[in-house]
Each structure stands twice: as C-alpha cells, then as structure tokens.
Amino acid sequence: MMVDNLNVSREVTHALLNYQNLLLKWNKAINLISRNSEKDLWERHILDSLQLLKYIDFSDIIIDMGSGGGFPGIVLSICGVKNTVLIESDKKKSVFLAQASKLSSNKIIIVDERIDEKFNMNCDILTSRGFSSVTNILGVTEGIKIQKKMLLLKGKNYEKEITEAQKHWVFDFNLHNSITSGEGKIVEIFNIKKLL
C-alpha cells in the first residue's frame, strides 16, 4: 500500500481504507472517479493527494477547489489538516463529501456552490486536482485571499498551462516532481497579481 514512507499512522491508514470503501460504494451511483482507475485508487488518487503533506502544515487553513471525490481535501483532512474547506458545486458529490467528512476528526466545511471572482474567503493554501486550467483557477479564485500559496496537482500539460496563465497573471512558482506520475508536477504558485 505505499503509505509507509509517508509516515502515516495505523489509525490514519484505517480511516483512508474506510474512505476508499465508501468512495467505491458511491462510485457505483455517481461518477466520483473513472471506473478504470478504481483498481489503482491508492496510487492514482490517495497517494497522489498524500504527497501534498510535504508542503502543508496541519495548522494551515486549506481550500480545496473542485473537490469531487475528495481529492486531495478529504485525504489531507484525514491525515491531520485541522481546517479544510471543500468547494464542490455538484450537489450529489457534495452529499458524498458530507458522508466522507465523517471519517476525519478534523473540521471540514463543504461549500456546495459554483464560485467566481466575487467569492470572498481566506485561506493559507488553496489546493486543486483535476479541476481546471491554471488560468481558470486563478480567475475563479480571485476573491480568495491566499496567505501562502496554491498547490495544484497537474498533468503533462503543466508547462503549457503556466505559459498561458502568465499572459493574464504575474506569479512566482516552483515545480515539484510528482511521486505518482512521471509526466505530472505539483505546481506551487505564490505572489499572485493580475495583469491590468
């Protein structure tokens, strides 16, 4: 199960297994993850989310954009992040997230509405996985005051997305190798300003 080298406790591993079982049960009724990725759930989804722990303090307030099946937000909360806000406009997925949030002993707030640049909230870190392009994420989160950084789990098109975003935004960024994808990166974005 590849969680040993991430210093995840037995209790957390047990909660993640319960989360996996709940997700697979719900996935029969609503599309939380691709049916093809069910067999690779730990590697493709849970471990992919767990790798963000390296860049997060448990005391950070996290906003997870487009939480869907709970990646990475639910996983981070189960692992110890004290305050997590999950943003998911799909009502069925929000109901699933409410059920999954019971597996965490930490505070989770679910916002089940579509957000735009007028949405007003504060956080330390904004996370996103498979939600949208870097440009779109920067646009819809314009009203969110991010104290530290964004952590975006991106696939092979990350360079193209960053280049496109730089046409509209000025920001600093770091690229971190993904432990689950040779082509993907964790894109860390900070000091964000919109070009006039």
What are these regions (language model features)?
Residues 138-150:
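A short glycine-rich, Lys/Arg-flanked "PGG" loop and its adjoining helix->strand segment in the class I
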Residues 126-128:
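Hydrophobic beta-strand segment of the Class I
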Residues 50-122:
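Conserved SAM/SAH cofactor-binding pocket of Class I
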Residues 1-59, 63, 92-106:
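Class I SAM-dependent transferase core
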Residues 82-85, 157-196:
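Active-site capping/gating segments
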Residues 23, 76, 154:
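Residue-level signal for inorganic ion chemistry
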Residues 147-159:
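Conserved beta-strand signature within the Rossmann-like core of class I S-adenosyl-L-methionine
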Residues 112-113, 135-137, 141, 156:
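Non-DNA-binding regulatory cores of transcription-related proteins
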